[in-house]
Amino acid sequence: TTMGAATDLDGYYIILNLPPGTYTVKASMIGYNTVRVTQVKVSIDQTTTVNFPLQSTVLEIGEEITITAERPIVQKDLTSSLSIVRSEDIARMPVEDLADILELQAGVSRDSDGAIHIRGGRSSEVAYLVDGISITDPFAGELSVEVANSGIEQLQVISGGFNAEYGQALSGVVEIVTKEGGQSYDGGVTVYAGDYLSTSDDIFFNIDDVEPSGLFNIEGHLSGPVPLFGDKVTFFANARYFDNDGWLSGERRFSPDDSSNFDASDDNNWSITDITLGDSAIIGLQNYLDYAKTRKYDRVPMNSTKKLSLQGKLTYRLTPTVKFSVGALLSDVDFREYDHSFKLNPDGMIRKFRNGLTVTPVLTHALSASTFYTLKFAFTKFRSKEFLFEDPFDPRYVDPFRKGGGKANAFATGGTQNSHTDRETTTLLGKFDVTSQIDKTNQIKLGLEFKRFELKFEEFEVVAAQDEQGFIIVPFQPAIPPIAAFNHNRYNRKPVEFSAYIQDKIELKEMIINIGARVDYFDANGIMPTDLRDPSLTLPVRTIDIFSGSELWANNVPYRLNPQDGSRALIDAETGAAFSRPLPSDAVFVDNAGNVLNDKDWTATGSWFESSKSRVQVSPRVGISYPITDRGAIYFSYGFFFQKATFEHLYLNPEFEIDTGGGSLATLMGNANLKNQKTINWEIGLQQQIGENLGLSVTAFYKDINNLIGAEIIRTFAADQYARFVNLDYGNVRGVTVALDFRPSREFSAFLDYTLQVAEGNASDPRSAFDDLRATPPREPEIETVPLDWDQQHTLNLNVNYSKGNNWGLGLIGKLNTGRPYTPTLRATRGVRSSFENSERMPLQFNLDFRAFKKLSFGGLSYSLFVKVFNLLDKRNAIEVFSSTGRVDFSSDILFAGRVQGVNTLQEQFNRPGFYSEPRRVQIGLTMDF
């Protein structure tokens, strides 16, 4: 890009609205040498200072002087903790995806499911942005579209207090700036393949069968000017396809429609059918085991992943002050999650699909050298589907009985997982921001943002079809339960969100201050039961029989008719509440016999349901940086941070159905009236340069978290119980981070950080209280603060890179951390706790990742041959343990378990490969640049 500015009489100048990246800045003045400064790094929301030592010359045009800029070790306008990772840094790291990069940042950890946690918060408390646009799926708080590492220009992770322009996050902000095209053509293709090389064949089935095609990746990018448009229009395009069979495998010994019988007390009478036997069966367990030894069954990947990601950006520089761009991201992910019980029947497991798309037109207009605005629009669609067969009436679905009858410690010898989930979130966004450097001291930024969501959701369980009399049809035929059933939920909701903010960056000689505030408005556009003791939309307890003339609800609680202008309003004699037709408009009342009451039967003035409340929140924030020397600065930040509830918790169980069972607890409901979750965050930190090449940073932080989502228990008129989400959970996080940044030369760099952190709360999951009371035996929900499930108290990260120019290079990442907590039990299957919740720790975890490359040139092209090794030492890190022993390789349950009614042994059942981290993975590849 070519942008510039004129200085004032003091030589002061500003250049605003530069995209993050690396630049060359040139200063010229009549009577002085021209000075060019190269390798100037520009980062998001940071001020980069470039001074020019001009020397006078006799001639009007003197010799040009070139200076190479060094990235400052101390960023003096830093007022909170953040990490910046540039595209050249990513290229040198042995990393695969965005999560691998995030995990290396101080205060960031990943749990056993791979979810990202920043400074001890829940995984849904992180905001993800691409080019200033949110790509966080509001249903579950996850990333809605994947961005390939090769398409990232700069990544910023804010783990401390963030400015007022950032909202809907409690723990941190991950902001990605994507690449855009330049004035010259640039492209490249990378191909690599690999597999797992591990000695842990006693844990991972068939891991010693090395297949170089088990992992394959191909990606490429191309950028430059669009032909016929000169340098006004440029483009960037990137594509990636990734296919990994995974490291957890099963054996195709049984097919979903196989049916075995293990009911006989004598295993000599068991009838066993596997995939090689067709419709015939072998009688007797030992006879079958002898037969199976003679057969070779197929290996089937059970945690495979396929990804396709596409990225593009078209940039049109209409004038020197006006730029218009359109960016697009598309990702398609197909994966499976390992289910140990299906190890011998892997074809019966469901598949999961994630599809994301975002399109973002952006107009940037510089009104003057000191003021510009951006106008952004975005269309984002995220769809998540989970099923075995897309058609729920697919005849390949079988009776759930074929899984093996649910025998204890037995692998499934047939059957299918019959759950279906399909949800789609569409977001329309408009955003307007203005930035103005009103003087040398103050940079004002303000903005408005509007979002309109549409959420479509449906989930059900494929069940056996029934005839008109309600009898199950034999043989099995798949069917969808009626919408009024407990195992079928469907809804469409259209919430809206609006926000506004203003912030001022005050740069004084003595200090830098970031101060601001934001206002957030959210309307869930949901409905809530008027009376929580009778919430059901499809089957209310207090149904009525108008025709009988009785003045009692179905549960014998009195009501009265209240004539008003000839209408018939129903008034509850106990509460005085008036009721009309329930919402939505297609819902009905029924009488005691189950007959539908039509509109003509009665008219009313009250309401069985009420609309949810809108929420407004104000968040003040301040950050201060105080330079103590020319090589050091102290910073402090304090702020209030709010986040709306995820849609999952707002709208769960939209018909408010209750699974009746004589007072037992079996139902959980959403709550469209949930309040915003709240965090008060403060931190204080020190940046210090030591010598010429070493930087030290120390940060202490504390977070007080309340209004988190939990569950409360409610009893109905019919003495049934149900749970619903409410704002009652709480927690706190405190810790210290120490980081060393060593940069002795351009060839070598090393970064080391250590985090001591304690994350505590009364619950790790919004469902915790619900699950506690449903346990056998039930237990009281936790009210004291205990370590959270992802609490990782000690974390040490090391990132070392060495490159000999562009010839060859090495990279090493080391990670060491204490294990996460678990709750000890006397016996895992009994669920009786032997101590407090999360009172014990899993073993220490250690991992090394390695990368090496060698550059080659021939035929006018540049090539790079590289190798990446993940888990270099093939460590068996435990990510889960048996709660009865705290060990990953032994459970005391095996001492008390009876004979397995199935074809597997107890040892096979209690060998849990899913309890271990990924074994050693080796990838070899080639990059061609042109």
Task: Outline where the language-model segments fall.
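Periplasm-facing N-terminal accessory domains of Gram-negative outer-membrane beta-barrel systems
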Residues: 1-64, 68, 73
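Short acidic/polar hinge/loop motifs at secondary-structure boundaries
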Residues: 16, 133-160, 202-213, 220, ...
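Membrane-embedded beta-barrel scaffold of Gram-negative outer-membrane proteins
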Residues: 64, 374, 378, 627, ...
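A beta-strand signature from Gram-negative outer-membrane beta-barrel systems
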Residues: 105, 148-188, 219-221, 229
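Transmembrane beta-barrel wall of Gram-negative outer-membrane proteins
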Residues: 211-334, 354-370, 620
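Gram-negative outer-membrane beta-barrel transporters
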Residues: 693, 697-711, 716-825, 927
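C-terminal beta-signal and adjacent terminal beta-strands/loops
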Residues: 807-811, 815-829, 845-847, 854-930
